[in-house]
Amino acid sequence: VLLSFLLRRLSPPTALVAFSILLAFAETGLGQGSETPDKPLSAQEADVASVTGEVLIPKLIHWCGDCHQGEDPQSGIRVDRLGRIPRDREILLWEEFREQIVQGKMPPEDAPQLDEQEKAEWLEKCEQMLHVAKSLPVPNRGGSRRMTVAQFQNTLHDLLDWQVDLTARIPPDAISKDGFTNHVESMGMSPAVAEAYFDVADHVVSNSLIDPSQPPAIQAFQMAFGRQINPAPCPDALVLGANSLLLPNSDFVVTENFPEKPFPYEPLRMQRTFRFIEGYVGNDTIREWKEFESIYHAVFACMRGTPGYPVGLAYESAPDGLLLRPAIPSPEIFGESNTYGPMANFKISLRELPSQGRFRVTVRAKKLEDAQLLSESDLLSPSEADPLSVVIAAADLGNGLQIADDGIYQLDVVAPSMEGRKEVRLLIDGLPFTHAIAASTAALPSDAASDQLAKVAGTPMLRIRLSKGEHEVAIDGPGAAEVEALCWRKLAPLSKPATDFEAFEGYGPFVGVHVGLRRDCGSTLNPVGPAQRVASTDWSDLVFEGAIENFPSPDVEKNNVNYLAGIREIGVRSEYYDGRPVPRLCIANISFEGPYLTQWPPPSHQQLAGNRTLESIDQNEVREPLGQLATRMFRRPATADEIDHLLSVYQKAKLGGSTNQEAYRDAATVVLASPSSFFLHEASLSDEAEPLSEWELASKLSYFLWNGPPDDPLLKLAESGRLTELLDQQIDRLLVDPRRERFLQTFVRQWLQLEKLDLLAIDRKTYPEWTRDLKASLRQEPIAWVGHLLDHNLPASHLVDSPWMMANEVTAAFYKLPDRPSGGPSFELLRTDREQLGGLLGQAGLMAALGDGRQSNPIKRGAWLARKLVDRPPEDPPPNVPKLPEGDISKETFLEKLNRHRNQPGCAACHEKIDPWGIPLQNYNASGCFVDLPSSETTSQLADGTKITNAIELKKHLAGQLADQVAWSFARHLACYAIGRDLTYSEAAQLKTQVETLAAARYPMRSLLRTVIHSDAFMTK
């Protein structure tokens, strides 16, 4: 299968070479290291084998064989299959046998019991055997493991500047019992996986190598905004599909501004003439050819979204830009937003974007010096504002507004005759402020004198900061005719209305860019990187970049005759987080450039072939770029034999009639498809433990802490032989690099099984606050928390209980925290006095994920805690768990039902290790929020006899008496992730001893990470 695939994609010489590479590597035993001939047993091994095989195992079979033999043994344990020389996991199993017999749990009560003398003799022999078995050396034979799909993607990104996400092309990685995808035993190399890696290698090389002599084609345009900015708007009535909502063409202008580059390129101008037969009259059906000629039939300013913005208008045009309020998410249906997207949903809709390459979107924006819109309840008390007001009758607005002092002013609108609620638009110095208001409670006297005008009350409309002097004021809108006067009052400097406004104007909106495609009933858009804050009222340029292939694109045939077919979209939003009032975002212009290139040939080509034009390259010059590429991809110096082999691939392709570029492509594909590129090797020369080579250490360290390849500083230290010497320095350097986020995202997600949250379908009728955006933030909360603990080397007890927590605007609103962060999606450290919060167990996303979205599940929570936080994993449940006995159980509490279940045969043993951890966590409901419950529903007794009455007590107990177990659990999981396999018994024992040295310092988190890296499990092979 694989050879057939290679012959389809590569030239025959290259295909055969690549196939032979894979076969040769597969024959060595992937991930297992090289085999060595059987050796005679040592004296110690012979003693262990004799005692185990002649005494211990026969007795176990005699005592326990009824339950633990045959095809369906209890707990999956067969005593007749035990090895004579216990190693690693079997040592743990023997320790469990010993413990069960000491405690009298084996044999069970209903079976014949052991004679005390016989029992004592067996235990003595078992203890002696275990003492010797634990000291036996474990053969080390190096090993190899395939990179995970994400690691291979990161390798292509970091080493070749490859930006396109290709992970969907490779079968997903299997998951180990600890939840990790990088475990050597699950990193097999099936034909399907091998074919996928070769396919990716071929795709990357084919799409990266270009002809540098051919100039690239670049698309570049800008859409600028402003009231009446367009001197020559399109005369046609522009309509874009059903529910068309387009910005007036007079308020935006599109230009194609091609930037200067240090290399020649071809400007890719957008099409301006079109001929369509349907789709150009909105939702109406029509079949009639019509011709169009204007760039405004190619590029639209679309505002289609969910209607009904709650306060003010979703968007308005100002003299110098487009004003946007936060894009409030639309209601969700089955976890997805409804058809038309959020409110305030601005998009550039256009017919043409590049099909491949990196693009750049630049948003020139500022924070508006805005007014805060008010509700009818925002009336001022006498102490909150100056007693004197500036009152202007509606008929006198043309005379302007005279402000005597700088300050914050509240505007009340006097409109006693207004019927219902109507929109009023106020223009202050040209800026629009639109609000729907109702009738005021006081009328303006027809013969009012100045002293009476000062006492006029009206409907609160807005608060705004005004400078001393004259301001132009105008009013229009549906309710303008019923407005009799405007009443301005200056707020007292320290009053609550004034401080609330200062908080409002101090907050900066966040700009988000989204790219995708238009649908008949909405859009499919993906974000281009994280949102960026606009903190200043001065103009600034915010840059967003991505690879166009990573975003949704329409699949339509060329020259489709439907006006609406194949529309791409670039969405620009003021992002919505916690619903607080936010100054509007003012956008002056949006620029697009793609492919975005700063040099030619691009970095992806240069990493493969340098600056060379491959068609004119001399055969003698090929060796250098191939050697450089192999060294980069292998993360060590390529040997002369390896380079000779690559050169022979090139030469064979040339002899077969390939061009220079085709031959080089074949050789480069072999490099990327080589096991040395996508396998992590630790080459061992003997069964004895050996230190990692400097090159191996560089890769092992970077794929641990970056989930990607080592950079030049690491490789230079490896080359000089000083990496081991400067290891701690490099650990710190890697952990402050942005790439460490890849480690946190991968390790924490897999350790804590956050994929359960991805699969959770919460009951939205019961928990309407559980939006898609909240779920996304709750998914990041544990990652942010573990990252903070590592960054600041805090005690491991903070994993489970802490007076601090990480929150962003979305989660802070969900938890109803009194102190709100102001960093949008970014997590900030907050102190909390609510003991149910702080630590992993207080995080709603984790607790909710361990349920079904309708009710909490103490069994799932208990099993998860036992496995992940205290490293006391219960056995897997038996295959055929019996049902609850028949009877009327409708009036039973959950604990009563649980007791009925656990008292059945085959259930109690597992639940003894699960339920005591999970029952106190009943304090967290299905949405993950803390609720007070009677202690009878949350009380349990742990195996050590400790009585726990609620979740808070459980957190304290874990952080106190069980802090050493929590620290060990973190360290063990971290070590298994770091080395890509389970720890051997001796490795675990050594690591545990090293971890215990940190007890006096309360197990600092970064120190635990250092301990893992300095352990023999990590540093030797």
Could you say what each language-model-derived stretch is?
Residues 30-77, 89-96, 100-105, 109-1021:
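Low-complexity, glycine/serine/threonine/alanine-rich intrinsically disordered linker
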Residues 1-10:
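N-terminal secretory signal peptides that target proteins for export/translocation
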Residues 9-17, 403, 466:
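Low-complexity, charge- and small-residue-enriched intrinsically disordered regions
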Residues 83:
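The substrate-binding groove and active-site-proximal loops of carbohydrate-active enzymes
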Residues 13-27:
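Bacterial N-terminal signal peptides
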Residues 80:
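Short, aromatic/basic-rich helix-turn unit that serves as a nucleic-acid recognition element
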